[in-house]
Amino acid sequence: MKSLFTALVPLLPLATALPLVSSESPNAQPKSLYPFSSSGSNAKVAGRLFNIDGKVEYFAGTNAWWLAHLSSNSDVDLSFSQMAATGYKIVRVWGFGDANTPPPSTNTDPNLVYFQILNSTGSYINYGADGLQRLDYVVHAASKYGLKLVLNFVNNWGDYGGIAAYTNAFNCSSTSFYTDATCQKVYKNYVKTIVTRYRSSTAIFAWELGNEPRCNGCETSVLTNWASDISSYIKSLDSNHMVTLGDEGWFAPADGIGDGSYAYGGAEGIDWVANLKIKTLDYGVFHLYPNSWGYNYTWGNEWIEQHDKAGKAVGKPVILEEYGTPFPYNHIETEGPWQATVLKSGIAADQIWQFGPNGTSVSAEVFGDVNTIYFKTPEYATLGTGHAKAMSKKKV
């Protein structure tokens, strides 16, 4: 979703003492301090479902964008242990942390860690203790708790850099980013850095091109062509893991779905059906925030059913990857019906936005938002643990 957090604020000049390596040289990466597990098996498509470690089933997952932006290993472990106890199978984590200059050293979690510096001279990867060592630990630890990760490479929104960091450095725009030669070269270098670093790990569920990519006012072919190009590139680097787009699921008029209003009009440059047909995208995702899009909450059930039907027509799995409502500690009335609709549908999985741990050294409310469901709260027993159990028990 469009995060409520402030992006990393560039205030300091680039420090040459920092452990930065040009993204032009991904083969020169320093080795991780933490081993990546190759035990078990890589997740893969099984019809309209997924095979995870030899088991084909429906399941629930969650989002924890902040996980690799925590400085404490114990906080990561605690969060993973609570997700595993819930019955979640996958967790979506930001695989990006972009800035134009390093954040102030006085920053605290989750605004201290950054993975990439972008400026007019190029892109530089931070392999230090406040950089990819944090993502290294997340990938390492996920295996210990039997969880698999969805890692994305860039944010449509300005939080934690995103496309705005590329536009600031290389003078592309939020729409030309997808076709600009320089921006795409740097983006692909970052993709290569992350994919080649973690491709041996069975903890990776899927690579994701971006968080909620949009190209407002563009022909939908712009993003479809970009998604085809980047997913093919990822497959050339790693043919063993799945790839997905990370979009909100907008339909276009050509799809013949819906009433032609905002979610169906293609104004954000997305044609969900056309993108789902891309051979190098293994499954489709969609998000659900009616309050942000001008729809009522009951419409969410229709949105779920429409994506299920379209996914069935194409023959690929579909995940409701994000959903939330702005009612802190009071989400059951609005989100419970959506979960019931998912249970009745052929949707393979859903991932609520978002998970809030209990007991971390940094208060979970620091990186939580109005949509967060917090572990051990009354609503969590229903929307978290209860729903995960119901999904896993659903007959295949």
Summary of predicted features, one role per range:
Residues 1-24:
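Fungal secretory targeting signals
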Residues 4, 94, 395-396:
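Residue-level detector of intrinsically disordered/flexible regions characterized by low predicted structural confidence
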Residues 17-40:
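Short, basic/low-complexity N-terminal boundary segments at the transition from targeting/disordered tails
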Residues 36-317, 323-383:
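Active-site mouth of glycoside hydrolases
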Residues 387-396:
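C-terminal helix/juxtamembrane-tail motif
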